[in-house]
From Swiss-Prot:
InterPro entries: Compl-Cell_Adhes-Reg, Sushi/SCR/CCP_sf, Sushi_SCR_CCP_dom. Glycans are attached at residues 57, 93, 174, 442, 493. Residues 295-317 have a biased composition (Low complexity). Monomer (major form) and non-disulfide-linked, covalent homodimer (minor form). Interacts with ADGRE5. Pfam families: Sushi. All the isoforms are widely expressed. GPI and TCS are the major forms, whereas SEC is minor and TCL is only present in trace levels. Disulfide bonds join 33-80, 64-92, 96-144, 127-157, 162-203, 189-219, 224-266, 252-282. Keywords: Cell membrane, Complement pathway, Disulfide bond, Glycoprotein, GPI-anchor, Immunity, Innate immunity, Lipoprotein, Membrane, Repeat, Secreted, Signal, Sushi. This is Complement decay-accelerating factor. Belongs to the receptors of complement activation (RCA) family. PANTHER family: COMPLEMENT COMPONENT-RELATED SUSHI DOMAIN-CONTAINING, COMPLEMENT DECAY-ACCELERATING FACTOR.
C-alpha cells in the first residue's frame, strides 16, 4: 500500500501541470499587447521597441527612415487597446527639401506651412514688396524633380524705382548708381551755404510702394560776423551783411599809415563763416627815411662853337721885348658841403671847345730885329667833388670867376706889349690872301701863340715890322683891337655874372 501512494500522487501532479500553465498564461496576456507592428520606411522611436509585451493603452511613435519624410495627414504612432495595436499605414515617403528662399520673391501663402514635397510637386512664388513682375510676365513656379531637387527659378521680378528726388536749391544731388530700391543718394551745398537736414537718403519700401528714407535737405547761406572796426581808420562802403567771398576794404584816416592787409575776405571753415585775415592797424605816419644811394654821375654838356675854317696868316713885326713865358695857373675852388645822408655826386662840366682845324701859314716881313717868341698858356679851371648837381654847378661858376680874371690879366699884358712894342707879334684870323700879298709879308720862323686852354686855341700869328705898310695896313691893328675888345667884353659879362651869383649865395 505504501508503494502505491507516491505513484498516484505523481500521476496526479502530471495531470494538473498543463492546466496550471494554461491558467498562468491566460492571466499574463489578458489586456496586454504583443510585439510592435512593422511600418515601411519607418521605425519605432521609443527605447522599448525590442519588448514583446506592452501593457494596455501603451502608445509607440514611429519615425521615418533617413531620406524619407512624413506624409502630412497620416498617423505615425500605434496604441495598445484591448490587447491589440491600432492600425497604421505607410506614412513616410521621399520628398524635396523646403523650396529655396528667393531675394526678390516669396512662396505663396498656400505653400508656406508645408514640409512634404514629393517628386513632381509644384510650388509658386510671388514678388516681394518693392519688386514687380517683369514684362512679359514670366512664371514664378518651381518643381520637385526626381532627384529630389527643385528646378531653377527664373528671375521674374525686378526692383521698383523711387521717384525723382527733385532739385536742391543752392546745392547738388549725387546719384552714385540709380534710383532703384536699395540705392543711396547724397546731398551737398554750394560754397558759402550750409546743409540743414540729412546728408543722404535711401530708396526703401513704404507700404506696397517705394520711397526715400528722408526728405530733401535745405542749403542756408553762410553769413560772416561783422568785420572788426579799427582805430584811426574805417571800412570802405560798409554793409549790413557779409556773405561768402565778400571783401572788406580798410583805409586809414589822414596822417596815418595802414599796416597789414587792406583787404580781408569772408571765407567758410567747418560750415562757419569767418574772416581770412586779422584787420590791419593804422599808425601815425613817420617822416620818410631816405635810404643810402649810390653816387650818381651827371654830365652837363658844354657849348661847342664852330668857327668858319680859315687859314692862319703869320706877320712878323718888330716890337719891345715881351716878359718871359708865364706858367699855367690852376685854380681849385672847393664846393660847399651840404649835410645829407646821400653819397657824394660828381658833376663834370666840360669847357667850351673851339675847333682848331686850321693849317698855319707863316709869312716873314723884314723887321728891325727878331725877338724870341713868347708862348702864354692858360689852362681852364675844373670843378669837382660836389655833393649834388646844384652845388657842382655853383662850384663851376666860382672856378670860372677866379679863372676869368687870370685870363683878363694875361690879355692885358698882351695888349700892353702890343701897344708898346717896336717889333711885335699879333694873332688873328685872315681869310683874304690879298691883304697878305699886298704887304709883301715873308715867312719867318719866329712866331707868337696865345693858347687859352686845351679847348680854346688861337694859332694865327702876324709879324709886322712897326706896321710899316702905312695907311693900307691899318686893317691889322683894327683886327687886333676888335679881337681884344670882344674878349674883354666877354670877360666883363662873365665877371658880372659871378658877382650876381656870389651875392645870391651870401644871402
Amino acid at each position: 500500500m505504501k508503494r502505491g501512494r507516491p505513484a498516484a500522487l505523481r500521476c496526479l501532479l502530471l495531470l494538473r501541470a498543463p492546466a496550471l500553465l494554461l491558467l498562468l498564461r491566460a492571466a499574463a496576456v489578458q489586456g496586454d499587447c504583443g510585439p510592435l507592428p512593422v511600418v515601411p520606411r519607418a521605425h519605432p522611436a521609443s527605447a522599448s521597441a525590442g519588448s514583446t509585451s506592452f501593457p494596455e493603452n501603451t502608445t509607440v511613435l514611429y519615425t521615418c527612415d533617413q531620406g524619407f519624410v512624413k506624409i502630412p495627414g497620416k498617423p505615425d504612432a500605434v496604441v495598445c487597446i484591448s490587447s491589440r495595436w491600432t492600425d497604421i499605414e505607410e506614412f513616410c515617403n521621399r520628398s524635396c527639401e523646403v523650396p529655396p528662399r528667393l531675394p526678390y520673391a516669396i512662396l505663396k501663402s498656400a505653400y508656406i506651412s508645408k514640409n512634404y514635397f514629393p517628386v513632381d510637386t509644384v510650388v509658386e512664388y510671388e514678388c516681394r514688396p518693392g519688386y514687380r513682375k517683369k514684362y512679359p510676365i514670366q512664371s514664378g513656379k518651381i518643381t520637385c524633380r526626381d532627384d529630389l531637387t527643385w528646378s531653377t527659378p527664373a528671375e521674374f521680378c525686378e526692383k521698383k524705382q523711387c521717384p525723382n528726388p527733385g532739385e536742391l536749391v543752392n546745392g547738388n544731388i549725387n546719384v552714385t548708381t540709380d534710383l532703384l530700391l536699395g540705392s543711396q543718394i547724397f546731398f551737398s551745398c554750394d560754397p558759402g551755404y550750409r546743409l540743414t537736414g540729412e546728408a543722404s537718403a535711401f530708396c526703401m519700401i513704404k507700404g506696397n510702394a517705394v520711397g526715400w528714407s528722408s526728405s530733401l535737405p535745405t542749403c542756408i547761406k553762410i553769413i560772416c560776423p561783422e568785420p572788426p572796426q579799427i582805430e584811426n581808420g574805417r571800412i570802405v562802403n560798409e554793409e549790413d551783411t557779409y556773405e561768402y567771398r565778400h571783401v572788406v576794404t580798410y583805409e586809414c584816416n589822414k596822417g596815418f599809415v595802414l599796416t597789414g592787409k587792406s583787404h580781408i575776405s569772408c571765407i567758410v571753415r567747418d560750415d562757419v563763416g569767418e574772416w581770412s585775415d586779422p584787420p590791419p592797424t593804422c599808425r601815425v605816419k613817420s617822416p620818410p627815411v631816405i635810404p643810402p644811394q649810390k653816387p650818381t654821375t651827371t654830365s652837363a654838356p658844354g657849348t661847342t662853337t664852330t668857327l668858319p675854317t680859315q687859314k692862319p696868316t703869320t706877320v712878323n713885326t718888330a716890337g719891345p721885348e715881351v716878359p718871359t713865358t708865364q706858367r699855367s695857373t690852376t685854380v681849385n675852388v672847393p664846393g660847399t658841403k651840404v649835410p645829407t645822408t646821400q653819397r657824394s655826386t660828381t658833376v663834370n662840366v666840360p669847357g667850351t671847345e673851339v675847333p682848331t682845324t686850321w693849317k698855319s701859314t707863316t709869312v716873314n716881313v723884314p723887321a728891325a730885329g727878331n725877338r724870341p717868341d713868347t708862348r702864354t698858356t692858360i689852362k681852364s679851371t675844373t670843378a669837382s667833388e660836389e655833393k649834388d648837381l646844384a652845388s657842382g654847378y655853383r662850384t663851376f661858376l666860382y672856378g670860372v670867376g677866379v679863372g676869368v680874371p687870370v685870363i683878363v690879366c694875361s690879355l692885358g699884358l698882351g695888349v700892353y706889349w702890343w701897344i708898346h712894342r717896336t717889333s711885335g707879334q699879333y694873332e688873328t684870323y685872315e681869310n683874304k690872301e690879298s691883304n697878305v700879298i699886298c704887304h709883301n709879308l715873308n715867312e719867318s720862323d719866329a712866331t707868337s701863340e696865345i693858347t687859352s686852354s686845351d679847348k680854346l686855341k688861337k694859332t694865327h700869328v702876324y709879324k709886322v715890322d712897326s706896321f710899316a705898310c702905312g695907311a693900307s695896313n691899318h686893317w691889322l691893328a683894327d683886327i687886333a683891337k676888335e679881337d681884344l675888345r670882344r674878349d674883354f667884353s666877354n670877360a666883363q659879362n662873365i665877371s658880372s655874372l659871378l658877382q650876381v651869383l656870389g651875392a645870391a649865395q651870401t644871402q
